[in-house]
Amino acid sequence: MWIKRQEGYCLKEIAGVHYLLPYGQKVADQRKGIVLNETGVFLWNELKTSMTDDALAEKLVHYYSADGEAANETQDEIQDQTKDKIQNQMQDQIQDQIRQDVKQFVQELLSLAILQECLRPCCAEDANDATCVYPTKEPFVECLEIAGMRIALYGSRELISSQFDAFLKDCSSAQGKSKSELQTESQIKMQIKMPVQMQIEILQRTTSFHPNGKTLIRNEELVVCENEQGYIILFPSMNQIREAHMTSDGRFAQIYVNGLDKEKTKEELFHAIRHFFLFFAQRQGFFAIHSASILYRDQVWLFSGHSGMGKSTHTNLWKEQFGTEIINGDLNLIGWSNGEQTNIGQNVDKPDSKGHPIVYGMPWCGTSGIASTKSYPLGGIVLLGRSDNDHFESLTNDQKIVRVMQRMISPVWTEDMLETNLKCAAKLAKEVPIYYLLCT
């Protein structure tokens, strides 16, 4: 667990006693101050930078196992129990006790919102290295592969929807491993045979206090806030999901659930994971369009329009009249391929890259229940509208770009994300036919 100080607390020595005192908003929130002994002061000072609770414990073990004489000269005010630990030369059981004491200290300060859990970059030396993994509390359970992107899932297998089954990838030998066997980054690397680009950890517990930061969007279904650690995401309409945290690059997300209703939790997680995947996919040059799709003459055609506009009606008519296969009943993922296998994170096809647009299969398909794991070239896009008679209307280039962009469900939390979606829509308008079909 990575931890860091909360903003709004300062350490003050008053008449020889060390106090951790709140200020600013923490006072307005009626947060309390606490007294720290010398060990607590040492731990607080070490937390100037974020670290794991294990690393913090090791620092304290090293601190107490330093030169014995020097330690006795400078630690006159340490509690008798701590002196005994030093005098016993830090026996293994004493070191274990110190580690337990540190974890208890951390948990107490987390409960008081003096410390906070944080998401830490997995490989600070190379954040783009796809072989890097984030340490997780929960065991590895499944690996998904969608459009060449591999997503490792951690937590309880009983919470993973069967709707992911067709997209499961055997990329690990970690099946059946206990939590203790998969705690460190190096251990996780050993268990995962193939590089994963994204990790999602499902935790059945409450989260510690986190500052919300700047609210980017808020509606009845989704709340997204941005802080220095990344994003905090809430799902107001979901009862089983408490909240979620995601790094700024989208490579690691933690979803906190109550898990009281397993089936409901499984259903909500399936839909919630889509948001994290689409955020990460957008950064890799993949974009989702709200549309139903058919396979016609080895190319996929998208029918896109507002709800109730007739997407399913059109695709079903094509199936009835021409025997075309329906690829996805609600959502289609588009990327670009130059004929070579995409190497995510290194040779990823961005919206401004060369190549032909490809429709990639993914598990999310609305209520249609129709999804595919296959990928095909994109033939074109048919935008649907209402009219008193059936006819096509020509669209100007700007209309094509804007209307396709408006049919995307790739995130637009920021201006940069909007710009990215517009670039994708402009590339589509240039490379494939886009029609506007009005029907009664």
Which sequence ranges carry the predicted segments?
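Hydrophobic packing positions characteristic
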Residues: 1-12
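Phosphate-/nucleic-acid-contacting segments
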Residues: 328
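Intrinsically disordered, low-complexity segments used as extracellular stalks/linkers
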Residues: 69-97, 177-201, 345-346, 350
